[in-house]
Curated annotation (Swiss-Prot):
Pathway participation: Cofactor biosynthesis; (R)-pantothenate biosynthesis; beta-alanine from L-aspartate: step 1/1
Predominant localisation class: cytoplasm
Oligomeric form and interacting partners: Heterooctamer of four alpha and four beta subunits.
Protein name in the entry: Aspartate 1-decarboxylase
């Protein structure tokens, strides 16, 4: 049996930009992508802490070191600049993989700077 498990999470990311006219996606600072082992064009689930919205899109690379979290296209309707997001990726795993698996959690602070990286 396969289970869909949390693979990585950027916790309390702050939206820095929202561009309704862009063709879609979520731009994420490359440093944050590396820290969470997330990849460009990977599907992500986003949870808006401020308003409870839940939505999905895909990743595009943001400028390294910028702290960028930009919502583009339809996703820009789901959050405002300054809103806090939880950004997650999931992966299918079999029972053997699940037994000893720990997701990668990246806790963010002001300016989307990394406060802590942990496996829960």
């Amino acid at each position: 049996m396969q289970r869909n498990m949390l693979r990585a999470k950027l916790h309390r990311a702050t939206v820095t930009q929202a561009d309704l006219d862009y063709e879609g996606s979520c731009g994420i600072d490359e440093d944050l992508l590396d820290a969470a082992d997330m990849r460009e064009y990977e599907k992500i689930e986003l949870y808006n802490v401020n308003n409870g919205e839940r939505f999905s899109t895909y990743i595009i690379k943001g400028k390294r070191g910028s702290g960028e979290i930009s919502l583009n296209g339809a996703a820009a309707r789901r959050a405002h600049v300054g809103d806090k997001l939880i950004i997650c990726t999931y992966a299918p795993m079999n029972e053997e993989e699940v037994a000893n698996y720990k997701p990668k959690i990246v806790l963010l602070g002001d300016g989307n700077r990394i406060k802590e990286i942990k496996a829960v």
